Regions:
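Accessory RNA-recognition modules of RNA-modification enzymes
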Residues: 1-180
Length: 180
């Protein structure tokens, strides 16, 4: 975050950039804020809740400008930033990971842990629009009712203009009765 002093460990050194793992914040920015999500520390669904919303927006705009410049050689100027809502409940699309828990003999539903394939099971997500967040528990229940739930890959949820949509990725043959 701009203005912060941190201790970090270099994890990957590329030709034009590097990656580091934060170890300790030595001097936090006065703009740093407490994340509102209880899963923030472990979940990989979002990583900018500690930034004020204005800095989140400018960071995203800079990223889009950089991509257009590097990949297409275009200077797009200052694009208009459109956000569904302020703070929480703004994300209209998500991909939920599904994992079969052999010990509990059930499907776990959540998001991938940050920088990992491990699953962080969640019951709700405050970043999602409320209609999608409310679907997480019913989706988990549905997955556990399917005969072939071990073959589920992931679920994508999208809040369209006409309501929520769900795309289920299935990696095998659906079980008898699963298509009803």
């Amino acid at each position: 975050m701009p203005g912060e002093r941190v201790k970090a460990r270099l994890t990957d050194d590329k030709k034009q950039h590097g990656f580091a793992q934060l170890q300790k914040i030595l001097m936090p920015s006065p703009e740093r804020q407490a994340p509102f999500c209880p899963h923030y520390a472990e979940c990989g669904g979002c990583s900018t809740q500690h930034l004020p919303q204005s800095l989140q927006h400018s960071t995203k705009v800079s990223g889009v400008q950089d991509l257009f410049s590097r990949l297409a050689g275009l200077n797009i100027g200052e694009p208009e930033f459109v956000c569904a809502s302020a703070g929480q409940g703004y994300r209209r699309v998500c991909r939920l990971a599904i994992k079969y828990d052999k010990k509990g003999r059930r499907a776990q539903v959540g998001f991938r842990r940050r920088l990992s394939h491990d699953l962080v099971e969640v019951d709700s997500c405050p970043v999602l629009v409320s209609s999608l967040s409310a679907l997480i528990e019913p989706v988990r229940s549905l997955c556990n009712q399917l005969k072939s739930f071990r073959d589920l890959g992931h679920i994508e949820l999208c809040e369209a203009d006409n309501g929520p949509l769900m795309l289920l990725r299935h990696n095998g043959q659906p079980g008898e009765g699963d298509l009803a």
